[in-house]
């Protein structure tokens, strides 16, 4: 079940934060364009970037009501007023004036919200039923997995928590998504009528192929609605592409909207660093994604809170380390930096040189706790000890986490 998926994730990150680390998220309008190109039905609509365009679209279409949606990389838009049903051009213009170019704050994004650069206006659909449908990578079962529920329009995490019996999870064999028994199980579980069943079978086939062909890590249609005319329509969609596969999809690289990311994330990206901003007070610099998340877990277990995920990679230079530290201290919430390096490919003395250079160049005032292990570790420790800077050596990862937490907590 989907509950097992989220429970397998390391304690330092929630599901949305983990997705951010490895994925390129798309806007709803971008995801729907891809769905439509794959012959999956979506509501007719238009992207607008001005009140004039909104006014023209509403007046040119004969529908009595429209759904107007602010486009940001976060859920909870409806609760914050960012999704609304309108019935006139005047309402459309008022919505655009209120949100376009402004930041929309929801319970899923940062305190300052995210900028609304585009607004989607669509025809409304007369809905008979709302379903939940998604395809994800389930690391527990090591398989592409279809997740569905009869409780569409709700957050799947809430359904999993409160009504897990309403969720069905089906693992797919590679290149064999159309297992007849699985299809029958899903259709029966969702109680889909005979008129809609052929459409649903087609949706399974099309969406699976879309997922595989585009190297997606998430395809979520919520709600997937059955209209009063028995049409199956994707009313809303979230889509994330595995950014490690972008070299195969040059057409997708331009879809990344950097305005939706933390400015430090953009800076780190162009420096070749894997960085995700979080909301804690302990900056983390680690080599290797697995070690980085383990470090963050230990910080949490020690009573602290990580301010970021940062993997400098295995081939970082002194300049890379210096750049990484500058990005870390640009976060005003950071009270201490924890550097945890296992020197295999990367040499500990190079890391130490980068730390010392960054502290001297930028004038870093906050303490830096450093745990080094591996190639040239003694040379690295010697460099740090001789620097006479505010750098605290740690003998182990546990020792480093405890020292960082004590400093962050003012002890």
Model-derived segments and their meaning:
Residues 7-23:
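Short, Lys/Arg-enriched N-terminal segments with co-localized hydrophobic residues
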Residues 22-220, 225-339, 360, 373-387, ...:
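ATP-dependent carboxylate/acyl-activation modules
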Residues 65, 365-367:
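Proline-centered loop/turn at the N-terminus of a beta-strand
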Residues 323-325, 351-356:
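Charged helix-capping and loop-helix junction motifs
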Residues 344:
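Catalytic core of bacterial c-di-GMP phosphodiesterases, primarily the EAL and HD-GYP domains
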Residues 348:
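Active-site-adjacent beta->alpha loops and helix N-cap segments on the catalytic face
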Residues 367-373:
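Short internal beta-strands
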């Amino acid at each position: 079940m989907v509950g097992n998926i989220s429970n397998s994730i390391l304690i330092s990150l929630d599901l949305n934060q983990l997705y951010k680390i490895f994925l390129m998220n798309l806007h709803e309008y971008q995801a729907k364009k891809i769905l439509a190109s794959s012959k999956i039905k979506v509501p007719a609509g238009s992207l607008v970037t001005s009140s004039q365009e909104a006014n023209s679209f509403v007046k040119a279409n004969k529908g009595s009501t429209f759904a107007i949606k602010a486009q940001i990389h976060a859920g909870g838009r409806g609760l914050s007023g960012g999704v609304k049903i309108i019935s006139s051009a005047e309402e459309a213009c008022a919505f655009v004036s209120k949100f376009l170019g402004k930041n929309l704050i929801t319970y899923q994004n940062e305190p300052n919200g995210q900028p609304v650069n585009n607004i989607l206006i669509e025809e409304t659909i007369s809905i008979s039923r709302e379903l939940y449908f998604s395809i994800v990578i389930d690391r527990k079962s090591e398989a592409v997995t279809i997740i569905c529920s009869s409780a569409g329009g709700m957050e799947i995490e809430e359904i999993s928590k409160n009504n897990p019996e309403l969720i069905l999870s089906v693992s797919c064999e590679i290149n064999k998504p159309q297992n007849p028994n699985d299809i029958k199980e899903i259709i029966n579980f969702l109680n889909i009528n005979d008129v809609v069943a052929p459409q649903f079978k087609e949706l399974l086939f099309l969406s699976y192929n879309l997922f595989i062909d585009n190297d997606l890590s998430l395809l979520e249609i919520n709600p997937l609605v059955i209209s009063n005319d028995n049409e199956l329509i994707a009313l809303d969609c979230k889509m994330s592409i595995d950014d490690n596969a972008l070299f195969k999809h040059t057409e997708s690289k331009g879809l990344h909207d950097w305005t939706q990311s933390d400015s430090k994330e953009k800076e780190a990206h162009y420096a070749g660093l894997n960085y995700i901003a979080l909301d804690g007070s302990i900056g983390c610099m680690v080599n290797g994604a697995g070690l980085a998340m383990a470090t963050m877990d230990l910080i949490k277990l020690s009573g602290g809170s990580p301010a970021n995920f940062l993997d400098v990679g295995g081939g970082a230079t002194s300049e890379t380390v210096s750049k990484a530290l500058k990005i870390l201290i640009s976060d005003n919430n950071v009270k201490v930096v924890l550097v945890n390096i296992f020197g295999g490919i990367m040499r500990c003395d190079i890391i130490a040189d980068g730390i010392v250079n960054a502290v001297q160049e930028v004038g870093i005032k906050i303490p830096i706790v450093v745990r080094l292990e591996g190639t040239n570790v003694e040379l690295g420790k010697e460099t740090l000890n001789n620097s006479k800077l505010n750098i605290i050596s740690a003998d182990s990862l546990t020792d480093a986490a405890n020292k960082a937490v004590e400093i962050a907590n003012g002890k």
